[in-house]
Design a protein with these regions (language model features):
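Intracellular juxtamembrane helix-capping segments at the cytosolic ends
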Residues: 26, 108-123, 311-324
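C-terminal membrane-cytosol helix-exit motif in multi-pass small-molecule transporters
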Residues: 169-189, 377-379
Length: 383
């Protein structure tokens, strides 16, 4: 493994802790501060909206100032957003807490660019493996983030969880330590990135469209159910916070641990077959969720939810990098992430409403619609 890829992995571990901490805490804190129950998942949803709105900007900014500075600015920004969020908990401001989560989402949008940066420091044939390895770093984030957040939650007396976000600020800024030693590979000038095909020309390619569908709806299913899980488990089913946190950790680990083999599986069997497997894994989640809502069933459902996301998202991302030329990469990556995370934002925004108005089981059945869309795209678009 080359030095640059190793540094990106280490930096990603700390930069991405914002994501599992947000998943772990936002619904619980949202339920505490929100004026009505249906707004409990609004902070989580706004963090995803932040990801969506900053996705294209992140790619655009990096095309001008480079990956290294882009990642450093994002770490500083996430640190500031975490401090703002801690302050919002101290003064018990739901509005300010939502703003903090939105800005943290903006930082997460930049951290999603690590997977593309990884591709740029390896040979193109190694791209699926590089993407898998960089996503594998998410396991470290999944265990470091929530554990540190849980340990530090009472650091500020009378303001539970404010300490968690102070800890997140430290974790976020720590990623810059590794970026200092990162040597950005030489690329074409920023002016040349203005050339190449338009977005509509790019998306007219069947492979590009397939990559987009797989990634977008994988995120839709995963986010729709994951956002609702802490509230459904802890607040509705009265399962302990520690058990709820452990299920979320296992889910995030399941999202990234298969990355050890996913790249090799794609290389051996092709993108389509691995995407089909992802759909089947999602189906296991839905079937499991139709039974009793207990600790074990939540655990099994969320593990398979993570596995399905991994197969679909890595397949989609590794297929995407085959669909554009060097001068088009930031445009293609930016628009892809804009669409993927906009759909994720819609799923996250609607999760709290659907959970409040329907049920956990109904939400899982709704996800069948997304699975049908992915399956249809696979059958109609042959890769």
């Amino acid at each position: 493994m080359n030095k640059n890829l190793s540094l990106l992995i280490l930096s990603q571990i700390f930069a991405f802790t914002a994501a599992p901490v947000t998943v772990f805490l936002s619904g619980i804190i949202g339920s505490k501060f929100s004026p009505i129950n249906t707004l409990a998942t609004l902070p989580m949803a706004l963090s995803v909206v932040g990801i969506a709105l900053f996705a294209f900007f992140a790619a655009k900014l990096m095309s001008i100032i480079g990956r290294k500075l882009g990642f450093i600015y994002a770490s500083v920004g996430t640190c500031f957003a975490s401090l703002l969020t801690a302050y919002s908990i101290i003064i018990e401001s739901f509005v300010l807490y939502n703003l903090g989560c939105f800005l943290i989402g903006g930082g997460i949008a930049f951290s999603h660019q690590y997977r593309f940066a990884a591709v740029e420091v390896v040979d193109k044939d190694y791209a699926p493996k590089a993407i898998s390895i960089i996503l594998l770093a998410g396991i470290g984030s999944a265990f470091i983030g929530p554990n540190i957040a849980n340990i530090s939650k009472g650091f500020i007396s009378d303001h539970m969880y404010a300490g968690s976000y102070l800890a997140l600020a430290i974790l976020s800024i720590s990623s810059t330590i590794f970026l200092i030693f990162y040597q950005e590979p030489k690329t074409i000038s920023s002016n040349q990135y203005k050339t190449g095909r338009s977005f509509f020309e790019l998306i007219s390619q069947p492979r590009f469209l397939q990559a987009l569908v797989a990634s977008a709806f994988a995120y839709a299913v995963m986010t729709f159910l994951m956002t609702a899980t802490p509230i459904s488990m802890h607040l509705m089913e009265k399962i302990s916070l520690s058990k709820t946190g452990f299920v979320i950790q296992l889910h995030i680990a399941a999202m990234f641990l298969p990355s050890l083999v996913t790249g090799n599986l794609i290389k051996r069997f092709g993108h389509s077959k691995i995407m089909y497997v992802g759909v089947l894994l999602f189906l296991v989640t839905i079937i499991t969720s139709l039974f009793e809502q207990n600790y074990i069933n939540y655990m099994v459902a969320l593990i398979f939810l993570g596995l399905g996301w991994n197969f679909l998202f890595i397949s989609g991302t590794s297929l995407l990098v085959l669909c554009y030329r060097e001068e088009e990469k930031f445009r293609a990556q930016g628009y892809n992430d804009l669409i993927v995370y906009s759909i994720q934002a819609l799923a996250s925004l609607s999760a709290g409403v659907f959970l409040s108005l329907t049920s956990w089981k109904t939400m899982n059945l709704i996800c069948l619609i997304f699975l049908i869309i992915i399956a249809l795209s696979l059958s109609l678009i042959h890769i």
